[in-house]
């Protein structure tokens, strides 16, 4: 499972959400800050002929898009990464003003949900049907429709209308508005050496972060790109890395601007007064106290003070609770989610697989202070080459290459473990584990195809990733291929599992006996198995009303195909079996590792909430998210609890999280490495309505 990258036809809304990378020099020219580019009004011209594009991830060709123009425009878009990807067919009919008067989208999302979307203008009214249901609107409100499941070609559909508008801003259907900003002009070169002038743009209003793309000097789509993925005009594939690096730099500059506005650095010690401190050892809250921060350390935990000291900044905690910064243990780190995780009280990540160069750049930006984000602990991702492989980390074709990858990660010095993935040859795993352990690294991962969890336990895994990866071994035949969507759709078989059966008990007892961990990622399983078209996903109910309209729309979309009532029942019962399995694992002593594989932030709060359903108390959940994970990563001397001498990583909530864990969803203050952040400052920068007010600073 990896939701971390654009994984479905919803790509338009996710183009800038993933993260990272440094800005590549333009051809052989020296890299410079681009001058502001003025967006000029452009006439609406309908293209002719065929346009073709190549989809690429980290330099690898993974799919294509073809656009055929005639009386109508037909778009075919498909790519495959990690054994899955969207398949989209669109038919668009434009009026004389370039506005789609009919737009039909069909196909399947990355995880198999069927796409049957349509939009049509009839007279003075617009009618549309998407996963949320059917709606209509008067054309006086807006006449440009934002498709829910479109291909990246939708960027061009929107852009040419925005370019023709005076202020490059348009109200859109179903709600909201789009805004276009030109970024820079540059020249690219085709494989034949022909130069082409392009302009890059940022499109805002669809998602939390802008989408980045480029048009050529004729106004045609040239590319859409983020830090990992690029869809580029055929014949210009050599420009893919450059485009990705530009998208990364554009995003970095945006976040730099935001963090300059939201980061509070004080020139004297700061005391947070009148607070209770969560103690993960006693699983309780302290009496009312004050916590003093000097530079980036906790200097003292004292009694409440009655008046401000001229030598200190005093913040009124108003009787709220301080909790140590939390650990998102299944991240795929990206700059698009970094600041939002800080706002959610997540101050540490364990990255579970990434483009190694891109992640190095992100870590450098965070550690240098250029970007705000969690501390990142790295895992070395190793995948076997196959028609279904993921394109992260290092790809290998032989056991010797696999061992070489292990050694490379060990030599870097900052990877605490390796992560083995789906297409790895199971026969190579024992040697990889031996090498990793000899070099001081732990081993975690998926269960490779054509084997099972028992074999990986015997090979020496320290931790298994995703609860379905363990459970599939109890329901699949040996020749069934989990490199495909089968590893998700086969979860419909989980209701038949008998937790007390010998096979299940052997697996769980073996894990417990070896002191192994399970990173179950409950929230992603809930999302895959319980989300339904037209209904708000269960994990989003508590925050959806604060989100931008595009996110609210997305929240009412199924992730998997629910083709029949039997599918609905099977997935619901299968999810219940997942909870039963994780409860049994915990009861037997398997270490539970909390992570989302869904970007952390709001979903991380839901992940923690779900552990109450396996029998954990609220205090036990908070301890797991803080001190237990700091200990798991060998960082408990510095992080994981609020005590003098430790790093100042913690957050303030108005309520009592022991009485109600939902209190962690209303954070008023976050301190990370001695810098102070009010989520009420951060969220509006992403179009999110804050969940609570900032605390009062009593003296400055």
Spans of features found by a protein language model:
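C-terminal motif of bacterial Sec signal peptides marking the signal peptidase cleavage site
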Residues: 22-25
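Solvent-exposed helix/loop surface patches that form functional interfaces
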Residues: 45-48, 60-62, 112-199, 225, ...
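N-terminal mature ectodomain segment of secretory-pathway/periplasmic proteins
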Residues: 55-130, 219
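Acidic, glycine-enriched loop/beta-strand segments at the rims
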Residues: 260-264, 277-290, 602, 617-622, ...
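Histidine-rich, glycine-flanked metal-binding segment
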Residues: 282-323
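Divalent metal-dependent hydrolysis catalytic cores, especially in the metallo-beta-lactamase
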Residues: 338-358, 375-382, 412-424, 433, ...
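Active-site neighborhoods of metal-dependent hydrolases
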Residues: 407-424, 470-614, 687-689, 698-700
């Amino acid at each position: 499972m990896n939701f971390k990258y654009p994984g479905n036809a919803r790509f338009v809304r996710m183009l800038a959400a993933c993260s990272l990378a440094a800005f590549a020099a333009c051809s052989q020219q020296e890299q410079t800050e681009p001058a502001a580019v003025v967006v000029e009004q452009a006439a609406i011209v309908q293209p002719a002929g065929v346009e073709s594009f190549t989809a690429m991830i980290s330099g690898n060709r993974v799919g294509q898009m073809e656009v055929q123009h005639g009386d109508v425009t037909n778009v075919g878009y498909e790519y495959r990464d990690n054994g899955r990807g969207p398949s989209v067919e669109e038919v668009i009919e434009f009026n004389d003003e370039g506005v789609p008067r009919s737009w039909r989208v069909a196909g399947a999302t990355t995880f198999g949900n069927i796409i049957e979307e349509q939009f049509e203008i009839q007279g003075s009214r617009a009618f549309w049907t998407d996963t949320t249901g059917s709606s209509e609107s008067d054309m006086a409100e807006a006449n440009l429709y934002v498709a829910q499941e479109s291909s990246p070609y939708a960027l061009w559909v929107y852009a040419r209308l925005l370019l023709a508008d005076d202020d490059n801003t348009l109200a859109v259907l179903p709600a909201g508005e789009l805004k276009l900003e030109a970024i820079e002009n540059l020249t690219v070169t085709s494989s034949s050496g022909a130069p082409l002038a392009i302009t890059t743009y940022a499109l805002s209003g669809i998602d939390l972060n802008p989408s980045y793309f480029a048009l050529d000097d004729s106004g045609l789509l040239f590319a859409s790109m983020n830090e990992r993925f690029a869809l580029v005009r055929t014949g210009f594939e050599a420009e893919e890395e450059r485009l990705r690096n530009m998208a990364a730099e554009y995003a970095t500059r945006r976040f730099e601007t935001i963090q300059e506005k939201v980061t509070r650095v004080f020139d004297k010690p700061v005391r947070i007064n009148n607070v209770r401190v969560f103690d993960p050892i006693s699983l309780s809250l302290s009496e009312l106290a004050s916590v003093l921060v000097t530079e980036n350390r906790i200097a003292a935990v004292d009694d409440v003070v009655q008046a401000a000291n001229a030598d200190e900044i005093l913040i009124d905690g108003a009787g709220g609770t301080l909790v140590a910064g939390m650990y998102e243990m299944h991240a795929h780190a990206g700059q698009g989610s970094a600041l939002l995780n800080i706002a959610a009280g997540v101050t540490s990540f364990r990255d579970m697989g990434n483009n190694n160069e891109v992640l190095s750049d992100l870590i450098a930006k965070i550690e240098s202070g250029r970007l705000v984000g969690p501390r990142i602990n790295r895992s070395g991702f190793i995948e076997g080459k196959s028609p279904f492989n993921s394109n992260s980390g290092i790809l290998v074709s032989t056991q010797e290459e696999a061992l070489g990858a292990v050694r490379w990660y060990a030599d870097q010095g900052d990877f605490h473990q390796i992560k083995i993935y789906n297409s790895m040859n199971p026969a190579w795993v024992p040697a990889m584990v031996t090498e990793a352990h000899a070099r001081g690294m732990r081993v975690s991962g998926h269960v490779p195809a054509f084997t099972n969890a028992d074999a990986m336990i015997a090979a020496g895994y320290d931790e298994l990733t995703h609860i379905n990866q363990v459970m599939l071994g109890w329901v699949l035949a040996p020749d069934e291929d989990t490199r495909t969507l089968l590893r998700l759709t086969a979860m419909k078989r989980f209701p038949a599992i008998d937790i007390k059966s010998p096979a299940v008990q052997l697996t769980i007892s073996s894990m417990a006996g070896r002191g192994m961990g399970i990173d179950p990622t409950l929230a992603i399983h809930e999302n895959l198995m319980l989300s339904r078209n037209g209904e708000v996903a269960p994990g989003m109910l508590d925050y959806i009303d604060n989100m931008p309209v595009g996110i609210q729309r997305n929240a009412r979309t199924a992730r998997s195909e629910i083709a029949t009532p039997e599918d609905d029942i099977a997935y619901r019962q299968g999810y219940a079996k997942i909870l039963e399995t994780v409860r049994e694992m915990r009861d037997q002593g398997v270490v539970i590792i909390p992570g989302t594989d869904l970007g952390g932030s709001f979903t991380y709060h839901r992940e923690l909430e779900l552990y109450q359903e396996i029998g954990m108390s609220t205090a036990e959940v908070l301890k797991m998210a803080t001190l237990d994970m700091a200990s798991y990563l060998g960082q408990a001397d510095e992080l994981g609890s609020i005590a003098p001498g430790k790093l100042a990583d913690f957050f303030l909530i108005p309520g009592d999280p022991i009485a109600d864990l939902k209190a962690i969803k209303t954070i008023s203050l976050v301190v990370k490495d001695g810098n102070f952040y009010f989520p009420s400052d951060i969220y509006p920068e992403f179009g999110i309505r804050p969940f609570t007010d900032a605390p009062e600073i009593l003296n400055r």
